[in-house]
C-alpha cells in the first residue's frame, strides 16, 4: 500500500492541530466549574461526561496526520488513568502546553533533542519537589476530601468512600455497582464471601431466609468430588462426637454422599451443609488455600498425600459464624493465625505486582481483600440511566484518587502543587542554552492546569496565577468559591501520585513528539486505488476487479 509522508514543519503542524482538537475538547472539563461533554453513541442514549479520559477515548479524526497527534496525547490520558486513576485532564493540559511552547522553540531553530533533555531534567526536579510537598492521607477526613474533589465536588461520594475504607481497610476491595434507588448507598460484607451457595436447599436451617447458619462450625476443605459416603464416614463420626456442625467445601458433593448428608440433616442428626468450591482450575485450588489460611484448616488433597479416609479434626478449619445462602457463602471470623493470613496476603500482593493481565490483577485483589477483612460495595443511585453512567464514572474516578492518596499522600489541589513545584526549577541549569529552554518550557507548562481551572470558572487567569505565585506553601485559589486561602484547610487536595504521574506522562509523550521530524501514514484508499479502475478498456470500469 502506498504511503503519505510529511516532513519537518509541515508534519509537526498537522500533528499539533490534532493535539489541539483533542486537548481543547478535554480541557473544558477541568476544575469544579468545568463543563460537560456530550458524546454520541451508535446505540442507546448519548453519554454525558466530565471525565477527561472518556472524552479523549472517543476522539478519532479524519485527517490521519492530525489523528496521530490526537492519539499520542490520548495515550497521556490513558496512561495517567491506568497508573493513578485520575488526573487525566491535567495530564492532557500539561502535554498540550509543553508541545505548544516546545514547537515555538523548534521553529526558532533550537535542537529538539536538547529541548527534550532539558524537559526531562526539569521533570525529575519537579517530581522530587512534589514528594516533599506531600503529606500522608491518614484520616477519614482527608480521604473524604480527596474523593469529593475527584467526584466533581460531590461530598456524599467522598464520605461514602471514606466510610468504605474505614470498614474494609485501605487495602480492602471496594466495588462500584449500579443501585436500584435514587440514593447512593454503602453495603459492607464482613468476613470472606464467595459466590457459591448450598448444593441442596434441604441444607437450609432458617426457613424464613432460606439460609444455613452455623455457629462455630468445623470446615472441611477438599479439592475433589465426594460421591462415596464411605470416604467421609470416619470424619463425620469424629465431628458428631464434638456436637458441632460441619461445612463441607468441595469440588462437588453428589450421589450417595449428598443423599446421606441431606437425610442426616433433615432427621436432626449431624448438622451439615455442602458447598461447591469457588473458582475453576488453578484459581479454585488457590481460593481453597485462602479459605484454609483464614480458618486455620488444611486442604485435603491427594496431590500432597492427604485422603478423606484418614482426615482428622486437626485438619479441619473453624470459624465463629458461617452463613450459606442460595448463591453465596460468608465465613466470619475464621480461626486462622493472623501471621499466616498476613503472609498469605503479602504473597498475593506480590502476584498482583508481577501480573500483566488486568483480569488476573482484579481477581487477585479480590482474594486479597477477602482475606484482609471484607468487601464494600458502593451502590450508585440516579434518576435516569444517562445520569447513572455519568455518576458511576465519577465514583470510579474518586475511588482511584483516594487509593492514590493513601499510597503517596496528598498535596494542595487546584493546580497549586505544580505551581509550588516550579520553585525547584528556578536554580536548575542544563548543559547548554537549548536545555535551559527545555527547563523553561516545563516551568511555563506547569502553570497551565491552574490557568485552565481559573478560565473554566470565568475569572482572569493571569491575575490569579500571579496572586498564587506571590504566596507560599498551601496558599492557593478555590475556584468553587472564588476565595484565596490554605488549600488543605479548604479541603482542596490532590493525591501526590496523580500530580506526579500527570507531569511524568505528559512530559514523556510531549518530549517524544517534539523530536518528530517525519510522519508516515497510509494513503486513503481512493488516492492509489482509483487509477486501476480505469484499466478495464470497455469493461464498464470493471478492470480494477481483476
Curated annotation (Swiss-Prot):
Binding-site residues for ATP, renumbered to this chain: 29-32, 50, 86-90, 414, 478-480, 494
Organism: Psychrobacter arcticus (strain DSM 17307 / VKM B-2377 / 273-4)
GO molecular function: ATP binding; ATP-dependent protein folding chaperone; isomerase activity; unfolded protein binding
Purpose of the protein: Together with its co-chaperonin GroES, plays an essential role in assisting protein folding. The GroEL-GroES system forms a nano-cage that allows encapsulation of the non-native substrate proteins and provides a physical environment optimized to promote and accelerate protein folding.
Main enzyme class: isomerase
Protein's gene: groEL
Predominant localisation class: cytoplasm
Protein name stated in the entry: Chaperonin GroEL
E.C. number(s) listed in UniProt: 5.6.1.7
Amino acid at each position: 500500500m502506498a504511503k503519505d509522508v510529511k516532513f519537518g514543519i509541515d508534519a509537526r503542524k498537522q500533528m499539533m492541530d490534532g493535539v489541539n482538537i483533542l486537548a481543547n475538547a478535554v480541557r473544558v472539563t477541568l476544575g469544579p466549574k468545568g463543563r460537560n461533554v456530550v458524546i454520541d453513541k451508535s446505540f442507546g442514549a448519548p453519554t454525558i461526561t466530565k471525565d477527561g479520559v472518556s472524552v479523549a477515548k472517543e476522539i478519532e479524526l479524519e485527517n490521519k496526520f492530525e489523528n496521530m497527534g490526537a492519539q499520542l496525547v490520548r495515550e497521556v490520558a490513558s496512561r495517567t488513568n491506568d497508573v493513578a486513576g485520575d488526573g487525566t485532564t491535567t495530564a492532557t493540559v500539561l502535554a498540550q502546553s509543553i508541545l505548544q511552547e516546545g514547537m515555538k522553540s523548534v521553529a526558532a531553530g533550537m535542537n529538539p533533542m536538547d529541548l527534550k533533555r532539558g524537559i526531562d531534567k526539569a521533570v525529575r526536579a519537579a517530581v522530587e519537589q512534589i514528594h516533599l510537598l506531600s503529606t500522608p492521607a491518614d484520616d477519614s477526613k482527608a480521604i473524604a476530601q480527596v474523593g469529593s474533589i475527584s467526584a466533581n465536588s460531590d461530598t456524599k461520594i467522598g464520605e461514602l468512600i471514606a466510610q468504605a475504607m474505614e470498614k474494609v481497610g485501605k487495602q480492602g476491595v471496594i466495588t462500584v455497582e449500579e443501585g436500584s434507588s435514587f440514593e447512593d448507598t454503602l453495603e459492607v460484607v464482613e468476613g470472606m464471601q464467595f459466590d457459591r451457595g448450598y448444593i441442596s436447599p434441604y441444607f437450609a436451617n432458617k426457613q424464613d431466609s432460606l439460609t444455613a447458619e452455623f455457629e462455630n462450625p468445623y470446615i472441611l476443605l477438599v479439592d475433589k468430588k465426594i460421591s462415596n459416603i464411605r470416604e467421609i464416614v470416619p470424619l463425620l463420626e469424629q465431628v458428631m462426637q464434638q456436637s458441632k456442625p460441619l461445612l463441607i467445601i468441595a469440588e462437588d458433593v453428589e450421589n450417595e454422599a449428598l443423599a446421606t448428608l441431606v437425610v442426616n440433616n433433615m432427621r436432626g442428626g449431624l448438622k451439615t451443609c455442602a458447598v461447591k468450591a469457588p473458582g475453576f482450575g488453578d484459581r479454585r485450588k488457590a481460593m481453597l488455600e485462602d479459605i484454609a489460611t483464614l480458618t486455620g484448616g488444611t486442604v485435603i488433597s491427594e496431590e500432597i498425600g492427604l485422603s478423606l479416609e484418614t482426615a482428622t479434626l486437626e485438619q479441619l478449619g473453624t470459624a465463629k459464624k458461617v452463613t450459606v445462602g442460595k448463591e453465596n457463602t460468608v465465613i466470619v471470623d475464621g480461626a486462622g493465625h493472623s501471621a499466616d493470613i498476613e503472609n498469605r496476603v503479602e504473597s498475593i500482593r506480590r502476584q498482583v505486582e508481577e501480573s500483566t493481565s488486568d483480569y488476573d490483577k482484579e481477581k487477585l485483589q479480590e482474594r486479597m481483600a477477602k482475606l484482609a477483612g471484607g468487601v464494600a460495595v458502593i451502590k450508585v443511585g440516579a434518576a435516569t440511566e444517562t445520569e447513572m453512567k455519568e455518576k458511576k464514572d465519577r465514583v470510579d474516578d474518586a475511588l482511584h484518587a483516594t487509593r492514590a492518596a493513601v499510597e503517596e499522600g496528598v498535596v494542595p489541589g487546584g493546580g497549586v502543587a505544580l505551581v509550588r513545584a516550579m520553585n525547584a526549577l528556578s536554580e536548575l541549569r542544563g548543559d547548554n542554552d537549548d536545555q535551559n529552554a527545555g527547563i523553561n518550557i516545563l516551568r511555563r507548562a506547569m502553570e497551565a492546569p491552574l490557568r485552565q481551572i481559573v478560565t473554566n470558572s470565568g475569572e482572569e487567569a493571569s491575575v490569579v496565577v500571579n496572586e498564587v505565585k506571590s504566596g507560599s506553601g498551601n496558599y492557593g485559589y478555590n475556584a468553587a468559591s472564588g476565595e484565596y486561602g490554605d488549600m488543605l484547610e479548604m479541603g482542596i487536595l490532590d493525591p501526590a501520585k496523580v500530580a506526579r504521574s500527570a507531569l511524568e506522562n505528559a512530559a514523556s509523550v510531549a518530549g517524544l513528539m517534539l523530536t518528530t521530524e517525519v510522519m508516515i501514514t497510509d494513503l486513503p484508499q481512493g488516492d492509489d486505488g482509483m487509477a486501476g479502475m480505469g484499466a478495464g478498456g470497455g469493461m464498464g470500469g470493471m478492470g480494477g476487479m481483476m
